[in-house]
From Swiss-Prot:
InterPro entries: SprT-like_domain, SprT_Zn_ribbon, Uncharacterised_SprT. This is Protein SprT. Its cofactor is Zn(2+). It comes from the Bacteria. The keyword Transport does not apply. It comes from Vibrio campbellii (strain ATCC BAA-1116). It holds the Pfam family Zn_ribbon_SprT. Binds 1 zinc ion. PROSITE patterns: ZINC_PROTEASE (PS00142). Belongs to the SprT family. Signal peptide: none annotated. GO terms for biological process: response to stress. Zn(2+) binds at H73, H77. One of its GO terms (cellular component) is cytoplasm.
């Protein structure tokens, strides 16, 4: 991971913690930060470990969005857990931390271009449309561990034989 980006990420994390300490009038431990999330997820918060993991490839491609949105998003999960205990991941407690404490819109998903991190996908079909399935889901179908169904017509999806990416 780029040293400068890593430093900026830690600064943003520390600023978020400082804002939370001021808002809740208590101290919070500084979370550990790693850069080992893969796939399409931008980041993950591990509540019991007080750890934030970020996707290094998406971070390098979208540094400003990570610093302004993704890192506060993940820190807000940790703060909500430490203040309120087990709550819904994007529930009112988390939204309150995002909007009232961090002054960041409480968005639950990112809109980054994921072409550089997207794994292989395979085309599946039902009675009304086609679906791209990830390699993980495709392999579960092949091993007969899962059957996926269309959300519209409820028919089981079947592999067309085409790899999309």
């Amino acid at each position: 991971m780029d040293i400068e980006l890593s430093y900026k990420a830690k600064q943003v994390m520390a600023n978020c913690i400082a804002m939370a300490e001021q808002a809740f009038k208590r101290s919070f431990p500084i979370p550990s930060l790693t850069f080992n999330v893969r796939g399409k997820a931008a980041g993950k918060a591990y509540l019991q470990l007080n750890e934030i993991r970020l996707n290094p490839k998406l971070f390098k491609e979208n540094p400003q969005a990570f610093l302004k949105e993704v890192i506060p998003h993940e820190v807000a999960h940790l703060i909500a857990y430490q203040v309120y205990g087990r709550v819904r991941p994007h529930g009112k407690e988390w939204q309150g931390v995002m909007e009232a404490v961090f002054k960041v819109p409480a968005k639950t998903t990112h809109s980054f271009d994921v072409a550089s991190v997207q794994g292989k996908t395979f085309e599946y079909r039902c009675g009304c449309m086609t679906y791209p399935l990830s390699i993980r889901r495709h392999n579960k179908v092949l091993r007969k561990e899962a059957v996926y169904s269309c959300q519209k017509c409820r028919q089981p999806l079947s592999f067309t034989g085409t790899q999309l990416s």
